[in-house]
């Protein structure tokens, strides 16, 4: 479809060739159609008509003077005037007119509402599509707000997480410290035990050495005569013991 | 006052000024330019929907080169439909009943398609003169026949439209006269004839739309062959 662009100020300035940039720059704003924005909205419905062709304004116009029947009287009078004065002559075209009029009225009455709803549906679909885009955008933005609020709530609980982590770290440090303390204690004990054992060993060795020396010296000091005397003494003691035992046994 | 039934087809003039110019310019008035709005009123919506749909349908079988003709064919269709339908109203003059107008549409447009075909793809354009699968002995005869068929196309286009509309209008006038004359004498017969007139008017409405559509469709077909 061809659109007619009406520029205000369509003067000699615009009569140049299309290559001249100056043409567009010199278009005045307050006269061009851009100054009319925003465009006032179109009326929702067309003008009211009675009987399909006579606008309601005619009836409103005549009502103060002639009442409700005024326009009808006017119409009838006009028709009869034209017929009687033979301004309009009834001929074969009248019947052709009646016939085509019947076809038109039948068509409008039968298909009018459906065509109107069809046209409305086309427009409504357009509006619905745009509305859907708008609704989706709004829904996604609202969802974004909800998500942001949730994140903020999550952030509030963050200190609990930090406390738990801090506890964990403290525990680890404590455990580590105790382990090391334990290790140190063990090491020191080991060293000290060693020293103690060493001293014990010394003492034992000294003791054994002394005992050995004493035994050696005693053994060396036992003369053979003393040895014989001790053996004889032992034998006599044994005999005495044997006797006492026998005597105890017989009693 | 009509002298003969053919006076309705005389090109009207008033004080030497031809009225046919007004009759031809009238359809333009009836289609308002869509305003620069997103949502329009019902009339503009329907008008826009119809033109879009029609042009889409018409351009379906055409390749991209043929789409250059979209504006011409769509506007031609709207023009012819409006003129034909307006001609059905009483006391109107239908410009498409004039053979001169219809030939003025048919010959240049048909010639344009032929010249486009001959210039851009002469082999294919000439190849259309021989349908596929013809038996060999028939080829010379068929070429002659196809050439005649090609050359008669503009004549057929123009005369088809003229004849259909003229015949329809004439019939309407005749039967309406019959009703008019019979009404005082034999009212019953007049009423039956009036019924016939009603049916004929319905037919004429259909013919008006169909003939315009056929004109444009055939042109698009010729274009399809050649572009």
From Swiss-Prot, chain B:
UniProt entry tagged with the keyword Glycoprotein: no
Residues passing through the membrane, by range: 9-29, 69-89, 98-118, 135-157, 179-199, 202-222
GO cellular component, one term: mitochondrial inner membrane
GO terms of molecular function: proton channel activity; proton-transporting ATP synthase activity, rotational mechanism
Localization: Mitochondrion inner membrane
Record's subunit section: Component of the ATP synthase complex composed at least of ATP5F1A/subunit alpha, ATP5F1B/subunit beta, ATP5MC1/subunit c (homooctomer), MT-ATP6/subunit a, MT-ATP8/subunit 8, ATP5ME/subunit e, ATP5MF/subunit f, ATP5MG/subunit g, ATP5MK/subunit k, ATP5MJ/subunit j, ATP5F1C/subunit gamma, ATP5F1D/subunit delta, ATP5F1E/subunit epsilon, ATP5PF/subunit F6, ATP5PB/subunit b, ATP5PD/subunit d, ATP5PO/subunit OSCP.
Protein name per its UniProtKB record: ATP synthase F(0) complex subunit a
Protein source organism: Cyprinus carpio
Top-level taxonomy: Eukaryota, Metazoa, Chordata, Craniata, Vertebrata
